[in-house]
């Protein structure tokens, strides 16, 4: 009886961890008319409405006296603010530059499985948020093109997720152009900077192969 209770408790904790890990990461869609995916965002992020058809997980704005998300917070000869926004921490990239990065990096943990090496033609690689590994997992341990298998709940679960953007790259579905835009126009791999509709003044990193 004690074993069964322990097993039930472990399964309950696993289910809760899996539900929490399914919340959207930075630049993931989290709402909009017709959207049927997850509507929560990871710690340190908020679901920002971009229009009636599209909402996106964005970093929470910095409060008075705090460095905004992904802003500089340290480095040689730096004399500015060092306190990051809630959910972010000051991370040293090199001796000259430290940046406010997400405090909880679980969605971008070290990949455990190659995203481009399917185990065999009989197995179908997982789509985004599909399970791809973990204790007693018996399914395909690979993900579709452009996704990586990340360990999201320790040894219990791994999930197919999109890799984070590299320095200078714009994340999936993030703005990459348009009237008054001054940021980077280079999208992450597999995505292209395109107008969201004909004649639109707003450009976004969209899949090359929808």
Curated annotation (Swiss-Prot):
Highest taxon above the source species: Eukaryota
Key word NADP present: no
Name used for this protein in its record: Putative polysaccharide-binding protein
Signal peptide: 1-22
PROSITE patterns for the chain: CBM1_1, CBM1_2
Source organism of the structure: Porphyra purpurea
SMART domains in the cross-refs: fCBD
Pfam families in UniProt: CBM_1
GO terms under cellular component: extracellular region
GO biological process, one term: carbohydrate metabolic process
Gene Ontology molecular function, alphabetical: cellulose binding
Keywords: Repeat, Signal
Stretches assigned to the CBM1 domain: 23-62, 63-105, 125-165, 166-210
Repeat found in the keyword field: yes
InterPro entries per record: CBD_sf, Cellulose-bd_dom_fun
